């Protein structure tokens, strides 16, 4: 009898390695699928490990460029910070992983997809909603959520089935990383009063250890897309990874955040996102230079909403599609170069230029070259203040009598 095929989102870690064996024992033929979205995974090692622990097939996909161009770029152009602080690191990669899982499932004729999320986090929602949006007919299984084992029980199961237990299993932190940044939780970080230890960080240095000399970078954008760093053209993925190194060594992009999770609890998260913070700041400055006032004032409303829909696992929803369409329509004239100083945890914009700049120095100056017609201000003020003046005149005639 042919076994039912299931595609597992495989990381190479303990949870998903145990999940392979558990699914095999449950009667499935397991096909492992692992993506590299910029965290520097050893895909060859992970591919072999999946087969070793029981998968019949193992897919490894280098998805860095697709992640950068189709997902991180949207977050950049949306200046996406969930609750004003979190630049959607993990939330951005989940829809791409779900998309690839569905593609492999279709290719292999699988009837189900499995993931390694617990029942306590946001990722279970993101994966399952995305999978159902792309393939409503596929079943979704969550072994880790279903078996409800303790960590000790999971380790014992692994040892009984000769599943390699990672040497860093005693790492107190739960870490997720992609090219847009690194997230860290658990361990001592669960106490919101505790100062995060330096061991919690990897992409950034402390302010005390940051250089005493700044780095100056120039980032050039074409239609809102970063295309070069310091005059060197490079792919978006490489630009982000390069900027992570440069900004990270200056301690840029450390975020300590109490976060309202989708599942209803608060969590304490520590993030590192040096490139994301730097690029968002630079992009915002270029928009300030090239946007008309009305678009500049309205776009933050869209930014807040798209941050929420992405965080809440609704990437493949009609609302997100509509929000992204608006976003892209605003980027046509976001062209130019931004100069940023990176120093002691700060990304400071020091210069900006654009062929589409709406800044007119002759209108802004207070020198003799001023071309602004100040006489026009009199009529403008009369019309602009007319509703306020009429309201004051009407209401000043109303006598309010208060009985004591």
Curated annotation (Swiss-Prot):
Keywords: Amino-acid biosynthesis, Arginine biosynthesis, ATP-binding, Cytoplasm, Ligase, Nucleotide-binding. ATP binds at residues 9-17, 116. It is found in: Cytoplasm. Homotetramer. This is Argininosuccinate synthase. It comes from Listeria welshimeri serovar 6b (strain ATCC 35897 / DSM 20650 / CCUG 15529 / CIP 8149 / NCTC 11857 / SLCC 5334 / V8). It catalyses: L-citrulline + L-aspartate + ATP = 2-(N(omega)-L-arginino)succinate + AMP + diphosphate + H(+). L-aspartate binds at residues 118, 122-123. GO terms for molecular function: argininosuccinate synthase activity; ATP binding. GO terms for biological process: argininosuccinate metabolic process; L-arginine biosynthetic process; urea cycle. The keyword Electron transport does not apply. Pathway: Amino-acid biosynthesis; L-arginine biosynthesis; L-arginine from L-ornithine and carbamoyl phosphate: step 2/3. PROSITE patterns: ARGININOSUCCIN_SYN_1 (PS00564), ARGININOSUCCIN_SYN_2 (PS00565).
